[in-house]
Amino acid sequence: MTTFCLVHGAWHDDACWAPLVAVLETRAHTCITPVLPLEDADAGFEDYARVVIDCLSGCEAPVLVGHSMSSAVIPLVAVERSVSLLVYLCPAMAGFQAPAGEPPYQRAGYVRPPVDADGRMWWPREQAVAQLYARLERDVAERIAARLRPQPRAVFNKPYPLTTPPRVPSAFLYARDDELFDDRWSRWIAQALLEVKPIELPGGHFPMLENPALLADVLERVSSPGGRIVI
């Protein structure tokens, strides 16, 4: 079966993948869930990628799934070692040089989290529950929000080593009602930058929490032979 390496986005840790891992493991897949060193204010995306690479020691050809911010992490892993597929999940596509004509990326109404004196972005718990996890059951939303970590803003300001994504098999999954990214931008960037047809998921920015069984279905499909959809 398939080995999925699930790389969380900003503020989170591996706990955000737990519902999806449970589904995938019942289907006999293997899941690896590295935890990025967000506590290191000096770390860049290359440092984040090194953590992922170290977790993949001995794994031949994993499927890398990068959520949100980690759409900038998984390409760097693919440059360093073999992978069978990159899955950009509700991706920010940070770091890459977008082609001309890029539409606004941010969803109207999205309110950015505060930034502290050390340049770290952090979510007050109630704001996170209301803005990020409104589709989840309240107890689940509060449990996830309680685990959020400050995200150093500096990582987004460091030079990114790639201008375009690596030419490896890739899939782009976006959420129709993503709370962070405008769906029109998501469809545009998938085709303009990755040259793949985007796959639409129902719901918001966290499909692994909102509908893990559906996400597992899609991941199985895109990682199967012929599953990538090329323009």
PLM-predicted stretches and their roles:
Residues 176-202, 209, 221-222:
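Conserved loop-alpha-helix segment in the C-terminal half of the alpha/beta-hydrolase fold
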Residues 79-125, 152-159, 181-182, 187:
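Flexible "cap/lid" loop of the alpha/beta hydrolase fold
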Residues 65-74:
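Gly/Ala-rich beta-loop-alpha elbow adjacent to hydrolase catalytic centers
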Residues 2-41:
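Conserved HGGG/HGGXW glycine-rich cap/lid loop of the alpha/beta-hydrolase fold
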